[in-house]
Amino acid sequence: MNSNFIEFIQDVLITIHENIRDLKERRSFADPEELAHIEGKLLAYYEILSALRSSATEFKIPHDQIGL
């Protein structure tokens, strides 16, 4: 697999995981209205990760090779 492509996917995954971590931290002191927004964003990030895992499996790309 092209090394630029792998670096790109890994960069995207790092960003997603950083955003998840930040949202989990914010969740601990969020007001109820913001909490609903945070939970929605977390769910969206988890769905993206799930889709990436499924696609990687379908295309026979080893998860560890791209950082899943």
Spans of features found by a protein language model:
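Short intrinsically disordered terminal tails
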Residues: M1, I66-L68
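N-terminal acidic leader/helix
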Residues: M1-A30
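Short, charge-rich amphipathic interface segments used for partner binding and complex assembly
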Residues: P32-Q65
